[in-house]
Amino acid sequence: MAIRVSHKSFLVALLLILFISSPTQARSLREVVRNRTLLVVEKSQESRKIRHEGGGSDVDGLMDMDYNSANKKRPIHNR
């Protein structure tokens, strides 16, 4: 005899499994975010140290930025 599972019970079981497993994924994502923020903080401290030691200046950063002038013509489709 084969046991026949209805679609509704299969769907309910699938949703239950997804509901139970979602908090564990959220906890692991929280750890990833913490690790990323630590990396960002470390990188910013390194860049401050380099600037303080004379390895770079703020003026160089302004020259490297992509700047569009204020009087740039708008595209035709926006007129």
From Swiss-Prot:
Protein name: Protein GOLVEN 2
Phenotype of gene-disrupted mutants: Reduced hypocotyl bending and dose-dependent altered root gravitropism with an impaired formation of auxin gradients, thus leading to an irregular waves root shape.
Keyword Secreted: yes
Residues that make up the propeptide removed upon maturation: 27-65
Organism placement in taxonomy: Eukaryota, Viridiplantae, Streptophyta, Embryophyta, Tracheophyta
Record GO cellular component, one term: endoplasmic reticulum
Main location: endoplasmic reticulum
Sulfotyrosine sites (modified residues): 67
Misc. remarks from the entry: 'Golven' means irregular waves in Dutch.
Record localization: Endoplasmic reticulum
Transmembrane stretches, start-end: none
Biological-process GO terms, alphabetical: cell differentiation; lateral root development; positive gravitropism; positive regulation of cell population proliferation; regulation of asymmetric cell division; regulation of auxin polar transport; regulation of lateral root development; regulation of protein localization
